[in-house]
A protein has these predicted regions:
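Short hydrophobic/charged patches on amphipathic alpha-helices used for structural packing
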Residues: 46-49
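Glycine- and acidic
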Residues: 29-35, 80-83
């Protein structure tokens, strides 16, 4: 939790909070990017920071980079482990090193962490499929199509061509997810 946060980051937090509406100040210019498409790996990112700073970028939003199933990553959004960086991008240590480098240079780092769904290989999904009611409650699951059909009336499909509908039948749970 926050108590375990590094002291220098707590000081930075307090300074920002003391500035009042700092988020309205236009002192931050952000950029979103995929690590692999911009720099290849997290270890390569520090060498790109001067270029970003030349552009006036001091706030970097990295698109999903946590472990997800090969070939089923949904662009990194089907996370199988929120505590592991996908090896294609590097390691958690590489991410921590990048964050430290950025902070030393007065830059901010934000991660795109998708908490509203997981991959079917995530620990929570595995426990839900094994019948653990606590973990089944982490997901919207239904025994029949009645409620999913109601959702489908107003909920736009994300991938209508490749994965039509917003619910999938899970044979292990015998439920719509």
């Amino acid at each position: 939790g926050y108590q375990a946060r590094e002291e220098q980051l707590k000081v930075r937090d307090q300074k920002k909070a003391a500035e009042g509406n700092w988020f309205l100040s236009q002192s931050l210019a952000g950029m979103s990017l995929y690590v692999d498409r911009f720099a290849g790996t997290l270890k390569s990112m520090p060498s790109k920071l001067p270029h970003l700073q030349d552009l006036g970028v001091n706030f970097l939003h990295l698109m999903p980079l946590f472990e997800s199933p090969q070939g089923e990553s949904d662009g990194g959004y089907a996370v199988s482990n929120f505590r592991k960086v996908d090896p294609r991008f590097g390691s958690l240590e590489d991410l921590i090193a990048l964050r430290k480098t950025m902070h030393e240079q007065g830059m901010y780092l934000m991660l795109d962490i998708v908490l509203n769904h997981t991959s079917h290989q995530h620990e929570w999904a595995m426990k839900a499929k094994a019948g653990d009611q606590e973990y089944q409650n982490y997901y919207y699951t239904y025994e029949n199509r009645w409620i999913p059909n109601e959702f489908e009336q107003a909920m736009p499909e994300i991938f209508p061509e490749s994965a039509p509908g917003n619910f999938t039948w899970n044979e292990e749970m015998k439920r719509w997810v």
